[in-house]
Amino acid sequence: MKIDVYVDIFAFFFAAGARKTVRYAASNDTATPHWKRRKMNDHTRFQPLGGNEMPRCGGIATMMRLPHVQSAEGLDACFVGVPFDLGTSNRTGARFGPRQIRTESVLLRPYNMATRAAPFDSLQVADIGDVAINPYNLHDSIARIEVEYDAILKHGCKPITLGGDHTIALPILRAIHRKHGKVALIHVDAHADVNDTMMGEKIAHGTPFRRAVEEGLLHGDKVTQIGLRGTGYAAEDFDWCREQGFRVVQAEECWNKSLAPLMDEVRERIGDTPVYISFDIDGIDPAYAPGTGTPEIAGLTVPQALEIIRGAKGLNIVGCDLVEVAPPYDPFGTTALLGANLAYELLCVLPGVTYRD
């Protein structure tokens, strides 16, 4: 009896250790359990787990049901969650964004039918989990995020971040700067996020790009902000951005038109400069994305959001984020579903992605 128990315990820990070394790849074999079937050599690229291998109601909720790995080593790109909302000024809940975005990503498939992008044909991509932020301390969380992104970037991996509130853009940009120097920025948002302080605090979700300019992280003449709108305290709210050289595209300029011509201008403006894309879900109209902390009416449409991201194809993208998804304010998961799709679209425009004929 005791011997059987010891054998079972040994088998459990042996299997747990073995699972850490599993490599994944697509397969048409449906008779063998997927975790065995997908063990391959080191040259095999990871693939999302398909609906014919595991029902979409099953499996572990990673982004696109990709493998979860412990670090960015050996990856070309990674999905990483930052479950943080200590910097919010209105409705909290963005800390649950990464988890819900992963859950709603279950229907995403590897091939982009519209653009013909096939990111998993050429890039090694995985979900590396979440940054272990400190839910009791904003400044400690910022430091932790910087450390984690330094570790990601040292491997040459491009992070696609699932937020989390927009405060996280600052520590990410600091790490990006240490790796790439000053970068260009495409910033989609209802708000400029260039407040000097919020309730006396220098670091919050409304201040990251003011700090980024002050710290010399951005090329001001290569920054484009799209979708800004709503009420403010003074005209200076947006004028400060223009004084730094930013191209400010208010939402009213986007109404009832394609944004493809705008993205032609953005690509010309940025050229081959390394660029970071920061996409706040509240840039999109709350009719499509109600689950966010600071909604503003009359925003961008979903097709316009796709035009912006797809229009970034060909740029030297070094990282991107999708932030401010707050699931508690959207019981149907629509906002997180949109966020998951936009994160996938960001993956599809990274350098090195192949396109099938």
Where are these regions (language model features)?
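N-terminal amphipathic/hydrophobic targeting modules at extreme N-termini
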Residues: M1-A11, K20-V22, A26, K39
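Position-driven detector of the extreme protein N-terminus
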Residues: K2, A31-P33
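Active-site glycine-rich loop that binds ribose-phosphate moieties when present
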Residues: R144, I168-P171, L185, A192-D196, ...
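Cofactor-binding loop segments of dinucleotide-utilizing enzymes, especially the Rossmann-like FAD-
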Residues: V82, G164, V188-A190, L228, ...
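Catalytic cores of soluble, metal-dependent hydrolases
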Residues: W35, N41-C78, R91-T92, F96-I160, ...
